[in-house]
């Protein structure tokens, strides 16, 4: 099982060990979810100001948030799916706020790496099509998160 993950650290604060942890966690999630080898995504670490801009411009919410997912497989009205014969599956992009990650880790009383892993996995599951808009969907998605984090050994 092998994902192709491009990491971008606009904050220049994220240690290599955290990048490696996220890579391994998302590989585990991909394996458990049956994601094809060679599937691509990007993970970008930003500050609160940058994620606030993205949240405002794309979601109409003028405030910082912890993680935003841009799923390339979400089809809008009138869009046509283009599938190339030998093209890898492209899931999309994850944007994670490092300051919010630190704040939430402290707020929830667990480690920075646990919160960072949780946010990366949460965003990854959104890229795979999971959501939490209804109680039923939330139960399914949060159950998946707990199962994968547990299998990976990243507990509260």
Swiss-Prot record:
This enzyme's EC code(s): 3.1.-.-
Necessary cofactors: Zn(2+)
Places the protein is found: Cytoplasm
GO MF: metalloendopeptidase activity; RNA endonuclease activity; zinc ion binding
UniProt key word rRNA-binding: no
GO-annotated biological processes: rRNA processing
Binding positions for Zn(2+) per the UniProt entry: 122, 126, 132
Keyword Cell membrane recorded: no
First-listed, main subcellular location of the protein, grouped into a coarse class: cytoplasm
InterPro entries in alphabetical order: MetalPrtase_cat_dom_sf_prd (IPR023091), YbeY (IPR002036), YbeY_CS (IPR020549)
Enzyme class: hydrolase
Cofactor annotation remark: Binds 1 zinc ion.
Keywords, ordered alphabetically: Cytoplasm, Endonuclease, Hydrolase, Metal-binding, Nuclease, Ribosome biogenesis, rRNA processing, Zinc
Cellular-component GO terms for this entry: cytoplasm
Function in brief: Single strand-specific metallo-endoribonuclease involved in late-stage 70S ribosome quality control and in maturation of the 3' terminus of the 16S rRNA.
Family: Belongs to the endoribonuclease YbeY family.
HAMAP family according to UniProt: Endoribonucl_YbeY
Name assigned to this protein: Endoribonuclease YbeY
């Amino acid at each position: 099982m092998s994902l192709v993950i491009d990491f971008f650290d606009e904050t220049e604060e994220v240690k290599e060990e955290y990048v490696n942890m996220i890579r391994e966690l998302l590989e585990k999630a991909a394996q458990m979810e049956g994601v094809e080898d060679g599937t691509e995504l990007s993970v970008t670490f930003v500050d609160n100001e940058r994620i606030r801009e993205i949240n405002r411009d794309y979601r109409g919410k003028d405030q910082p948030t912890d993680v935003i997912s841009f799923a390339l497989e979400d089809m809008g009205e009138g869009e046509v799916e283009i599938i190339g014969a030998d093209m890898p599956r492209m899931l999309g992009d994850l944007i994670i706020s490092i300051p919010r990650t630190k704040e939430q880790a402290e707020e929830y009383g667990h480690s920075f790496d646990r919160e960072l892993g949780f946010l990366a996995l949460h965003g990854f599951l959104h890229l795979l099509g999971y959501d939490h808009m209804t109680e039923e969907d939330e139960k399914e998605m949060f159950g998946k998160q707990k199962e994968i984090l547990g299998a990976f050994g990243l507990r509260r």
